[in-house]
Amino acid sequence: MTCQAFASSDNFVPLNSDSSPSLPLIMHHSAGECLPVSNHATNVVSTVPSVLSLIQTPKCSHFHFAMMTSGNVSAGLHYSVPSCHYGNQASTYGVMAGIKPATPEMLSASLSQSRILQTCSMPHPNVVNGVSTLQSSLTPCLYKFPEHALSASSCALGHSFTPMHQTLLSDDPTASDFKQEFRRKSKSVEEPVDMDSPEIRELEKFANEFKLRRIKLGYTQTNVGEALAAVHGSEFSQTTICRFENLQLSFKNACKLKSILSKWLEEAEQVGALYNEKVGVNERKRKRRTTISISAKEALERHFGEQSKPSSQEIMRMAEGLNLEKEVVRVWFCNRRQREKRVKTSLHQNAFSSIIKEHHECR
């Protein structure tokens, strides 16, 4: 028996067979979707009793099998299957075999059998005989229903079909190799890092040393992030530096950041050393304390008694006579006036306190 695809739905093409009567075939799939004839035919027919329980479900499309013999109806089967649609088509996928032009006898027989099936939970004996006759007389051509429309829960005929994609994937060695490779890579990525490894110990040691050396150089975590932006183009946030010092980054990210921070730390220490040397050379030295001899002090005391506020020319003359610098003589007179002022203030305070004391004693 051969099957031929229809160009459009609801067209009938007779099956070419000499041993069987002229059987029309309704189909809405292409010829490429026709499965080879196998023992699935028995499965389809054997599922009829289980389909009978689905008769009362709404929106069902009906399959009508009938075996015609020289104008007499020997047996007929009428049962419902949930409608299956594909895309925007409203047509129903299915097969229809053994239908001839309807006659009043055929319609009455179909109507009576439909009523019997709707009121009884078990199939009628005539229906069972009709199924046996149909199974022995017909060689149906099976078609694969759309997988998105027919499932094990929505269509009883789906129990006898195996999804094509599962068979292909299970038999394809390339797919199995790909799955094994994917599992191997996933396992290698998810392997935990050994916390006692030398790499972890070295990373902890560097994080502690980096924190101490950063504080010694006077940099904050924010300063480090801004300084790295000038070198690498992207600024590192203060949170990133803090998480690195506290070992809160992942091992992979911490290793990447370690090389960057190590290079920056070396450059920062070199710049800091050069800065300290430059500041040490240019730093203003403290002037050494000048000592004045006793004879020079006596001479300056005599001049102070004569003039407590000498002019600039007089200070220069005294400095030349005593072999001292002019600035030394000027500073000595300033200090001497301040000391005299403190002495006079203390004398006035003592005198005032003594007067007050005498006044209280007189009372």
From Swiss-Prot:
The keyword Protein biosynthesis does not apply. Residues 285-344 bind DNA. InterPro entries: HD, Homeobox_CS, Homeodomain-like_sf, Lambda_DNA-bd_dom_sf, POU, POU_dom, POU_domain_TF. A motif (9aaTAD) lies at residues 5-13. Residues 195-269 form the POU-specific domain. Pfam families: Homeodomain, Pou. Pituitary gland. GO terms for cellular component: nucleus. The keyword Nucleus applies. One of its GO terms (molecular function) is RNA polymerase II cis-regulatory region sequence-specific DNA binding. One of its GO terms (biological process) is regulation of transcription by RNA polymerase II. SMART domains: HOX, POU. Gene3D superfamilies: Homeodomain-like (1.10.10.60), lambda repressor-like DNA-binding domains (1.10.260.40). Keywords: Activator, DNA-binding, Homeobox, Nucleus, Transcription, Transcription regulation. It is found in: Nucleus. Belongs to the POU transcription factor family. Class-1 subfamily. The 9aaTAD motif is a transactivation domain present in a large number of yeast and animal transcription factors. Transcription factor that activates growth hormone and prolactin genes. Specifically binds to the consensus sequence 5'-TAAAT-3'. This is Pituitary-specific positive transcription factor 1. It comes from Gallus gallus. The gene is POU1F1.
